[in-house]
Amino acid sequence: MTDTRNGEDNGKLLYCSFCGKSQHEVRKLIAGPSVFICDECVDLCNDIIREEVQEAQAESSAHKLPSPKEISGILDQYVIGQERAKKVLAVAVYNHYKRLNQRDKKGDEVELGKSNILLIGPTGSGKTLLAETLARLLNVPFTIADATTLTEAGYVGEDVENIIQKLLQKCDYDVEKAQMGIVYIDEIDKISRKSDNPSITRDVSGEGVQQALLKLIEGTVASVPPQGGRKHPQQEFLQVDTRNILFICGGAFSGLEKVIQQRSTRGGIGFSAEVRSKEEGKKVGESLREVEPDDLVKFGLIPEFVGRLPVLATLDELDEAALIQILTEPKNALTKQYAKLFEMEGVDLEFRTDALKSVAKRALERKTGARGLRSILEGVLLDTMYEIPSQSEVSKVVIDESVIEGKSKPLYIYENSEPTAKAAPDA
């Protein structure tokens, strides 16, 4: 095979046998027995082969469903604590995709139902992270929707079918892939009924949205405009069957623990009164573990909606020790992320133990759980990240408790010199 660049052989102009471009229109023309191929067609062939290999790998990995123990083990690498929730999720997700792998087999008279999941836990306890990690592990399309932005059809706001549109966007509008995806609906507690008594007044963002979501979650054929276009009568829609999409709903459900305590301590004098005082002394997480479907109905979810979320998993409120673990142990721990950023500048970043404790305490005071850790560290390290790229002689930065509390600035250690601390800010 020969490489023809200018190809003035016999004064004849040469062309690519595949795309028809001349040798002057491409960078390189490769000659074979009576044929030529240009560099652009070679690149195109490589892309086609690469896509086919990736699709084959994705199909083979889809058939290799990890066991519940394996799923839980991978979740352990990213989510600290919440062992019960991880176990519940691992079993539910395993059974869901096992059901999908069985659905096309003939001769099986038992029809397996879908088990959607409801996650209940305080803000920043890991609900969204659990759902994200599951989708990444299973290599399926995943999208997050905020229930507070949803309204009934015909009202200003997001239509519930927009959720399916977002899922389609995640997989380049491949309907087959989307129908195997996972949807996480956050803040589901915010669309609860304002009271547990049915009302004749219109509740645009509450019960009405629950009714609309009900159809989507239990299984319907949603009509979605192609490539994100607006709906109009003459348009052809993509038809997406939601029967096999796994829906995971999550919410903090603030006040639900009181509903549970009222149920478990209803009435009572004498000895019962003593039991009631013990119930009231329970932590929120302990109370939430005793949740029953009737409690959710009392909270404001309609019975039909609760019935479509048969798998309940509760998450505990994170304490100081758990927050410190979150800062240091997971694969994507924040201290590891910031250390990597500093490493790119040739600088070591060290967090002292007292600094980690101080960060955890501040997050607890803000009641933001793990979600607030990044904003705390970002604020503490902002000035340092601003200065470091301009100071090539700095080899190490040390963060201690006084830095987190704003009493002093980080300790800078310079190459071939003694450690020096920046001057403390003016009081």
From Swiss-Prot:
Residue ranges occupied by any ClpX-type ZB domain in the UniProt entry: 4-57
Keyword rRNA processing found: no
Gene3D superfamilies (UniProt xref): 1.10.8.60, ClpX chaperone, C4-type zinc finger domain, P-loop containing nucleotide triphosphate hydrolases
Record bears the keyword Amino-acid biosynthesis: no
Binding site for ATP: P122, T123, G124, S125, G126, K127, T128, L129
PROSITE patterns in the record: CLPX_ZB
Example GO BP: proteolysis involved in protein catabolic process
Keywords for the protein's UniProt record, in alphabetical order: ATP-binding, Chaperone, Metal-binding, Nucleotide-binding, Zinc
GO cellular component: HslUV protease complex
Record-linked SUPFAM superfamilies: Glucocorticoid receptor-like (DNA-binding domain) (SSF57716), P-loop containing nucleoside triphosphate hydrolases (SSF52540)
Binding positions for Zn(2+) per the UniProt entry: C16, C19, C38, C41
Signal peptide interval: none
Molecular function via GO: ATP binding; ATP hydrolysis activity; ATP-dependent protein folding chaperone; protein dimerization activity; unfolded protein binding; zinc ion binding
Function: ATP-dependent specificity component of the Clp protease. It directs the protease to specific substrates. Can perform chaperone functions in the absence of ClpP.
UniProt similarity note: Belongs to the ClpX chaperone family.
Subunit note: Component of the ClpX-ClpP complex. Forms a hexameric ring that, in the presence of ATP, binds to fourteen ClpP subunits assembled into a disk-like structure with a central cavity, resembling the structure of eukaryotic proteasomes.
Record-given protein name: ATP-dependent Clp protease ATP-binding subunit ClpX
UniProt source species: Pseudomonas fluorescens (strain SBW25)
